[in-house]
Design a protein with these regions (language model features):
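N-terminal small/polar loop signature for handling phosphorylated ligands or for N-terminal nucleophile
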Residues: 2-23
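C-terminal accessory domains and tails appended to enzymatic cores
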Residues: 10-14, 33-39, 81-219
């Protein structure tokens, strides 16, 4: 459990977390507040993440999380730059003429923010495991096999990792039975390395089977 208190000045010898005021470790409202090398100033969230992020995700993932998730929120906090997540959390604030409820609203916002962070952490760690699994599969791939097609034993998120390779298609078991074939995008692009024939577009079931010549083809 944790406890919080709103005060105007920091307490001498206090060993908890002081943020936003009193030149505490996470106060970002001073003239000499820190700014990242890319020009985005630190807010309390960024300063907290700088201290705790590596412990949660490891150094490499913590840096990626800071760039993709923390920095936009810090920028919103410091400049007012629009950010949908910041707006969502801010929507928990009571209306100006609503009696009380500030603490309750705060804890609801904390609960939602906590769930979002937990999900984000799980996704980052899961993607890291996926990248390692893909590396293992690539290392054991038959050198005589078509280098542009990769067959996976199970679904593994791999679009980003494989964008750096020549692999154009990935085949993996479908949770609906059979197999899925998925084209891979070019690095830093929304375009595929190799697309299916345009004649296949929009076709389903028997029409797709007739056009492809595959009796089991479906979309």
């Amino acid at each position: 459990p944790f406890f919080f208190q709103r005060i105007q000045d920091s307490i001498e010898d206090f060993d908890g977390i002081i943020f936003d005021i009193g030149r505490g470790r996470y106060d970002h409202h001073q003239k000499d507040s820190r700014i990242r090398e890319n020009g985005i100033p630190y807010a309390a969230f960024g300063l907290l993440w700088e201290e705790l992020g590596t412990e949660i995700l490891g150094e490499e993932l913590a840096a990626k999380f800071d760039e993709a998730f923390v920095q936009p929120l810090d920028n919103n906090d410091n400049t007012g730059e629009k950010n949908e997540l910041a707006s969502l959390i801010g929507s928990f604030n009571p209306s100006w003429d609503e009696d009380g409820g500030t603490d309750e609203a705060f804890f609801r916002a904390v609960s939602v923010a906590g769930m979002i962070l937990d999900n984000k952490f799980a996704r980052y760690l899961g993607n890291e495991r996926a990248d390692k699994r893909i590396e293992e599969i690539l290392e054991t791939q038959n050198p005589e096999a078509d280098s542009r097609i990769l067959v996976l034993p199970e679904f593994i998120p791999c679009q980003k990792r494989l964008s750096e390779t020549d692999i154009a298609f990935v085949i993996f078991p479908s949770n609906r039975g059979g197999y899925c074939i998925q084209p891979q995008k070019k690095e830093y692009s929304l375009n595929y390395k190799c697309s299916f024939p345009s004649e296949w577009l929009g076709l389903e079931n028997e029409e797709l089977q007739k056009e492809t010549g595959l009796s089991s083809a479906s979309f």
